[in-house]
């Protein structure tokens, strides 16, 4: 059953959607097809693309100055070494922008190629209002709708590695 308006449900968000995670059916929506910048929600699509191109969870990465991005302070410093798994958790638990860039570098793709794969993945899911300009979500050009975010978030949560990381409340990084 779809609930399209319920006076007892007060939603303060400009756009929202509630879906049945098993069926994908919309249970409630409010301006769910209106496009907005999605900020760090972009990291879910980046995580999907990384999982598809993962060189191995134990792959060691040396953090670079060029990985640093504006936003929250990174948990890793230039020259420090860290596993792909720890970078993945840093990106999804702490929403570390630099960790996402490091994961991009670990795939061997350029940032532009990685973003192209994010957009290709969106198209393959039938998402027509979702566009990515960068993997971190710092770009206001990363846009989607609540309805389309629900689609790719659902796909992300079907991946055990992504689901586990996103549901983790805290994570201790190990520098190598």
Q: Predicted segment positions?
A:
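Conserved active-site loop region of the serine DD-peptidase/beta-lactamase
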Residues: 158-176
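Active-site-adjacent loops and short helices of periplasmic peptidoglycan-processing enzymes
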Residues: 1-147, 151-160
């Amino acid at each position: 059953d779809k609930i399209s308006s319920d006076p007892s449900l007060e939603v303060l968000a400009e756009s929202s959607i509630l879906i049945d995670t098993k069926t994908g059916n919309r249970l409630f929506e409010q301006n769910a097809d209106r496009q907005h910048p999605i900020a760090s929600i972009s990291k879910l699509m980046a995580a999907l693309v990384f999982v598809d191109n993962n060189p191995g969870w134990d792959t060691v990465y040396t953090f670079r100055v060029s990985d640093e991005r504006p936003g929250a302070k990174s948990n890793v410093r230039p020259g420090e070494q860290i596993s792909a798994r720890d970078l993945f958790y840093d990106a999804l638990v702490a929403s570390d922008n630099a960790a996402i860039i490091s994961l991009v570098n670990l795939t061997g793709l350029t940032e532009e190629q990685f973003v192209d794969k994010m957009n290709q993945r969106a198209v393959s899911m039938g998402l027509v209002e979702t566009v990515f300009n960068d993997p971190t979500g710092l770009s206001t050009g990363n846009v989607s709708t609540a309805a389309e975010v629900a689609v790719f978030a659902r796909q992300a949560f079907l991946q055990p590695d992504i689901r586990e990381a996103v549901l983790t409340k805290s994570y201790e990084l190990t520098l190598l």
